């Protein structure tokens, strides 16, 4: 076997792989054939691990095709091919000369690289170049409701047409409302539609960690090429970029490169883009270039539907009245609902008792007691007054100025949503008002949440504060 073996393999790989993929991962490799062992040298651990993970089978297939049973052993190393000791020049045929003169630079002798790689850091090997998309989170097991309807519709559109009109897609809302589920659902749908698509999901802190490792190990160019070569980049909790200036700088350029290439970006945050503190204005501006959608806390009907769906997944019968009992008392987010249901199911399995309202009340007694203690009308009034920088006495007064009337209506709507008090009881707690006044306030706030971004934001922020 001659030194042209790897050249032949490279030529075939160049035919089989997309041009950018070949240039990024295969072209940088150097080769050395010695004692029936073919050693491939990668410039850093990141490239080495990627090649071994993605192309090992293809390389072995080509070696077997060219060598038959005399296939060489294959090794990978980080560094450059060492300079061979001088040997007497052998007699070469014109064909040998032509083959060697046409060999790429990767097969020519270079000075050895003496860089040592820290075993703990493992260079850039820890960069997670797998998709990380959770196959369990799909559109068909996402429970749709009024609170997430627009977000779900936007996510479906993006999955059907990645890199299209909604780029970037920015989903925001409190913890446990389904933003991460939607990210994974989009990723799964894109891959289902196009199996070769390169879709990467990650938490924003992972991006920061990868960048730091790339900087530490002189692999920033590989880092850039990797992140800018994806078909869809899905980043959770973008607010964790706050005050990380170098990460923001790198993400800014990555963001621009992906948008210019019509590659899809989806971001999530716990707040509206312009309200993320510690993030540069130029980034916050770009976050809003596509479509920004709020994911709201689920309303009662959606909470019930979520519980019924999860019970069905566990092959557990959950009576409607039991689902309503739980949903009326746990209002903050989907994660809390699922946790409560898991607890109820576990208790039922341990005791062998049927799941009734009395059983649920017993199984969740500490959680329900905590909720009732935290969310009272008094607590709502104090929280709303503090939020709008007015006095609780203003909420109870007869004043009708908008600066007081609107917070009062919000507080009434929150009392109806977050407590089990009747409309007359809520009216009494707000200065002896009639129950029709409370009903009007609830309907008005529901209407304004559809029409006014500010009211929608205020309502979500107050729900999150009162339910946490």
UniProtKB/Swiss-Prot annotation:
Q: Does the keyword DNA-binding apply?
A: yes
- SMART domains annotated for this entry? AAA, Bac_DnaA_C
Residue ranges for the region (Domain IV, binds dsDNA) are 349-468
Q: Fetch the SUPFAM superfamilies from UniProt.
A: P-loop containing nucleoside triphosphate hydrolases, TrpR-like
Region Domain II, as annotated, extends over 84-131
- Localization per record: Cytoplasm
KW rRNA-binding (keyword) present: no
Q: Which UniProt keywords apply?
A: ATP-binding, Cytoplasm, DNA replication, DNA-binding, Lipid-binding, Nucleotide-binding
Region spans: Disordered: 81-113
Write down any Gene Ontology CC term: plasma membrane
Q: Where does ATP bind?
A: 176, 178-180
Q: Which InterPro entries match?
A: AAA+_ATPase, Chromosome_initiator_DnaA, Chromosome_initiator_DnaA-like, Chromosome_initiator_DnaA_CS, DnaA_C, DnaA_dom, DnaA_N_dom, DnaA_N_sf
| Renumbered residue ranges of the record's region Domain III, AAA+ region | 132-348
According to its UniProt record, which protein family does this protein belong to?
Belongs to the DnaA family.
Function, as annotated, reads: Plays an essential role in the initiation and regulation of chromosomal replication. ATP-DnaA binds to the origin of replication (oriC) to initiate formation of the DNA replication initiation complex once per cell cycle. Binds the DnaA box (a 9 base pair repeat at the origin) and separates the double-stranded (ds)DNA. Forms a right-handed helical filament on oriC DNA; dsDNA binds to the exterior of the filament while single-stranded (ss)DNA is stabiized in the filament's interior.
Q: Which NCBIfam families match?
A: DnaA (TIGR00362)
Name listed for the protein in its UniProt record = Chromosomal replication initiator protein DnaA
What species was this sequence derived from?
Answer: Vibrio vulnificus (strain CMCP6)
């Amino acid at each position: 076997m001659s030194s042209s073996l790897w050249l032949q393999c490279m030529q075939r790989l160049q035919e089989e792989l997309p041009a950018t993929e070949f240039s990024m991962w295969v072209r940088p490799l150097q080769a050395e054939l010695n004692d029936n062992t073919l050693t491939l040298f990668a410039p850093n651990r990141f490239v080495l691990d990627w090649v071994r993970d993605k192309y090992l089978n293809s390389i072995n297939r080509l070696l077997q095709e060219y060598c038959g049973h005399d296939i060489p052993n294959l090794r990978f190393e980080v560094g450059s091919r060492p300079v061979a000791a001088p040997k007497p020049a052998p007699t070469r045929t014109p064909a040998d000369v032509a083959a060697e003169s046409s060999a790429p630079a990767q097969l020519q002798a270079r000075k050895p690289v003496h860089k040592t790689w820290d075993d703990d850091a493992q260079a850039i090997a820890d960069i997670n170049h797998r998709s990380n998309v959770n196959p369990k989170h799909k559109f068909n097991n996402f429970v749709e409701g009024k609170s997430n309807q627009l977000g779900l519709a936007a996510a479906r559109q993006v999955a059907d047409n990645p890199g299209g009109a909604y780029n970037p897609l920015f989903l925001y809302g409190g913890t446990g409302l389904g933003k991460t589920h939607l990210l994974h659902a989009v990723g799964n749908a894109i891959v289902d539609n196009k199996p070769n698509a390169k879709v990467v999901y990650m938490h924003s802190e992972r991006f920061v960690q990868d960048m730091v490792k790339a900087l530490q190990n002189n692999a920033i160019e590989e880092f850039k090429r990797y992140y800018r070569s994806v078909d869809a980049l899905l980043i959770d909790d973008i607010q964790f970029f706050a005050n990380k200036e170098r990460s923001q700088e790198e993400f800014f350029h990555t963001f621009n490169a992906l948008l210019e290439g019509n590659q899809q970006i989806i971001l999530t945050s716990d707040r509206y883009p312009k309200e993320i503190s510690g993030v540069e204005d130029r980034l916050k501006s770009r976050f809003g270039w596509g479509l920004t959608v709020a994911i709201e806390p689920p309303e009662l009907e959606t909470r019930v539907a979520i519980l019924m769906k999860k019970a069905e997944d566990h092959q557990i019968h959950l009576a409607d009245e039991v689902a309503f009992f739980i949903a009326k008392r746990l209002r903050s987010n989907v994660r809390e609902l699922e946790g409560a249901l898991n607890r109820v199911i576990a208790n039922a399995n341990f005791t062998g008792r049927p799941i009734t309202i009395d059983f649920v009340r017993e199984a969740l007694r500490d959680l329900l007691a905590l909720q009732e203690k935290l969310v009272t009308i008094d607590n709502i009034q104090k929280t709303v007054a503090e939020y709008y920088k007015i006095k609780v006495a203003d909420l109870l007064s007869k004043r009708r100025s908008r600066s007081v009337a609107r917070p009062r209506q919000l507080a009434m709507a929150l009392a109806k949503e977050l407590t089990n008090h009747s409309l007359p009881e809520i009216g009494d707690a707000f200065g002896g008002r009639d129950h029709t006044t409370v009903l009007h306030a609830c309907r008005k706030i529901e209407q304004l949440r559809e029409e006014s971004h500010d009211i929608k934001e205020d309502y979500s922020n107050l729900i999150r504060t009162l339910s946490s």
